[in-house]
């Protein structure tokens, strides 16, 4: 007679044997990799260089802010930049890390806009994007945390499938659409929030707070509400 424990072991053994050994090892290694991930505030020139290079290579020209202004924003407290890093298995140097990606967030009052998230090409099969979002959702749990994506409902867009995939990724990670879109310097963007929402006026104020003087006027003239 089999008891319940024996049956569970048999089922587990059968399912494991259906997986190729190499595939199983890859799944286990990928699972282990995710738990070594850390988000570290920039403290070195090396981190800044890594972030700058990935930033330049990951986003379209029309969507990028001048990197120097982002660094100034960090000093002013308007921006928060993290280097996504994995601790190396190096017994000789236990404080050695590998660069895996970046996050750049814009802060104002209780609002946090995840302005940029990028993972290095070689690290994209390990679930680092989802793990990073988990870290950020916990880190900003006392804020209204949201992000922008290109309008995923524009079927005429050249990168329509990519937009759809990006939206599905964020929805899978617990984000949901705001009741409005925005025209951001000529690009229609959807706003996705994590258990939150905000008024368009608050969203606009967040951007105006980035820069002073002439830029405030430029922002007012180039960011518009798009009703759904």
Regions found by a protein language model. Give the residues of each.
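Short amphipathic alpha-helix that is part of the acyltransferase structural core
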Residues: 27-67, 202-206, 221-223
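Active-site rim helix/loop that mediates acceptor-substrate recognition in acyltransferases
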Residues: 56-91
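Conserved beta-strand in the GNAT
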Residues: 83, 96-106, 112-118
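A conserved beta-turn-beta hairpin within the catalytic core of GNAT-like acetyltransferases
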Residues: 107-114, 124, 143, 188
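A short, internal acetyl-CoA/4′-phosphopantetheine-binding micro-motif in the GNAT/acyltransferase core
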Residues: 117-124, 151-153
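Conserved acetyl-CoA-binding loop-helix of GNAT-fold acetyltransferases
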Residues: 119, 125-139
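Conserved GNAT acetyl-CoA-binding A-motif
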Residues: 140-162
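C-terminal "cap" of GNAT-fold acetyltransferases
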Residues: 163, 183-228
């Amino acid at each position: 007679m089999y008891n319940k424990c024996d049956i569970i072991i048999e089922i587990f053994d059968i399912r494991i044997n259906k997986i190729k050994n190499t595939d199983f090892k890859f799944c286990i290694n990928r699972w282990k990799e995710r738990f070594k991930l850390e988000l570290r505030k920039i403290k070195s020139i090396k981190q800044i260089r890594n972030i700058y290079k990935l930033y330049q290579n990951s986003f379209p020209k029309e969507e990028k802010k001048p990197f120097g202004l982002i660094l100034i924003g960090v000093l002013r407290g308007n921006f928060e930049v993290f280097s996504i890093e994995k601790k190396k298995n190096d017994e000789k140097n236990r404080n050695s890390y590998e660069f895996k990606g970046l996050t750049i967030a814009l802060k104002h009052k209780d609002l946090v806009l995840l302005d940029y998230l990028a993972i290095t090409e070689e690290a994209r099969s390990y679930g680092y994007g989802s793990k990073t979002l988990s870290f950020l959702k916990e880190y900003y749990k006392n804020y209204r945390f949201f992000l922008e994506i290109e309008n995923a409902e524009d079927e005429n867009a050249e990168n329509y499938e990519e937009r759809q995939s990006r939206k599905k990724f964020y929805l899978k990670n617990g984000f949901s659409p705001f009741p409005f879109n925005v025209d951001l310097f000529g690009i229609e963007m959807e706003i996705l929030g994590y258990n939150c929402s905000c008024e368009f006026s608050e969203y606009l104020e967040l951007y105006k707070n980035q820069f002073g003087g002439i830029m405030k006027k430029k922002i007012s003239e180039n960011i518009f509400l798009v009703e759904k």
